[in-house]
Amino acid sequence: MYQPFQHLDSDQVASWQSPEMLMNKSVSRESQRRKELVAGQIVTGSLLLLLIFWTLFGNILVCTAVMRFRHLRSRVTNIFIVSLAVSDLLVALLVMPWKAVAEVAGHWPFGAFCDIWVAFDIMCSTASILNLCVISVDRYWAISSPFRYERKMTQRVALLMISTAWALSVLISFIPVQLSWHKSETEDHLLSNHSTGNCDSSLNRTYAISSSLISFYIPVAIMIVTYTRIYRIAQIQIKRISTLERAAEHAQSCRSNRVDSCSRHHQTSLRTSIKKETKVLKTLSIIMGVFVCCWLPFFILNCMVPFCDRSPGHPQAGLPCVSETTFDIFVWFGWANSSLNPIIYAFNADFRKVFSSLLGCGHWCSTTPVETVNISNELISYNQDTLFHKDIVTAYVNMIPNVVDCIDDNEDAFDHMSQISQTSANNELATDSMCELDSEVDISLHKITPSMSNGIH
């Protein structure tokens, strides 16, 4: 049978519908769109609120722990951890909430506060990154020259380093922003600012590149160099300690004529050495990986956006523009680093005990640490007593009193030492320790008188 409407497309069929039907469909689509928008706003707001509260909680916990417990407060190096926590706390207080409200509302509702907020954003983010850089330099200095570090790293020196980082953060934020040196001079930017409810933080090319160099690229280069050298020091000293452990175990085992035991000890020590090297590499990879993954995408875009072609007839045509949504996502990725720093830098053994005391969760808190984080702070420790260096030497001499003469003269394993960490779990001497040569101390196994009379020749 012939059907008169079977060859008509959807637009032609719609033209035959009554105005009431079309209006109802339009209202239905609009209602559905609003529901999806509200649902998206609720999800976005909830996630951002959770991120802000976690950042506040973690960094307040770090600051409270150091202020309330004297043994943490007495360590000079914890000043750097507190400074990092303060900068991250300011990110959560002065930067995140205002942007979160703007994300949910869909516009900037705070008017002229935009310029001050931009200055706070640049200052707090830069301070956080520079504090991470200072911590890496502090750790490298402590590991490469521990005795010199113990003498020269005073509270005054630490405060001077921190003050320099904060002063630089203020200089590249408030002064340029208040003098409007940071703004893009295009008509698009001038017309799309506070009057349209948009806090456009578009930067001119000169300021975008110079501020990115100071805030990120130079600090990340320093961190890569320092942590690479820390890994090399750790790798060398793990092998040296493993050599001494094998010699000591060989002497003790062969003293009882246990040949099979000698071979087993050698294989076990070699596996332990490889395991410890892997731990150090994993630790440093986490520290650098988290930092780079959070901040690198933003700073790449930050340098790209000023060179964008914003309109077809733009006089400074260049790269295609990045969408505002994409840019905002990577901005939040950078700020999220402030929520991860307390986990990475403060969750070592000492801090975990204090946190469990503050939170009142006792045994449950102390038995649920993140293992990788624990490794990161105990392998790269810089709060230990330098007397432990001498203890290691004495212990090894007691274990292998006269076997020292059998060691090749070219291998002065403990001419000068530096400690990276100290084990306490099973009393294995220097199992998780790493040593580094230091020109200020002359400790040689050949120069120490054996303390046991029944040594093996």
From Swiss-Prot:
- Provide Extracellular-side residue ranges: 1-41, 106-114, 182-205, 310-326
Chain positions carrying an annotated carbohydrate:
N24
* Lipidated residues (S-palmitoyl cysteine): C361
One Gene Ontology term of the molecular function aspect: dopamine neurotransmitter receptor activity, coupled via Gs
- Please give an example of a GO cellular component term from this record: plasma membrane
Mark the transmembrane ranges.
42-67, 79-105, 115-137, 157-181, 206-231, 283-309, 327-351
Look up and give the membrane topology term.
Answer: Multi-pass membrane protein
Tissue specificity here reads: Brain and kidney.
Disulphide connectivity of cysteines: C114-C199
Please give the residue ranges for the topological domain Cytoplasmic. 68-78, 138-156, 232-282, 352-457
Which UniProt keywords are listed?
A: Cell membrane, Disulfide bond, G-protein coupled receptor, Glycoprotein, Lipoprotein, Membrane, Palmitate, Receptor, Transducer, Transmembrane, Transmembrane helix
Top-level taxon of the source organism: Eukaryota
Cross-referenced PROSITE patterns, in alphabetical order? G_PROTEIN_RECEP_F1_1, G_PROTEIN_RECEP_F1_2
Q: Could you say which protein family the record assigns here?
A: Belongs to the G-protein coupled receptor 1 family.
Would you tell me the protein name for this molecule?
D(1B) dopamine receptor
* Species classification: Eukaryota, Metazoa, Chordata, Craniata, Vertebrata
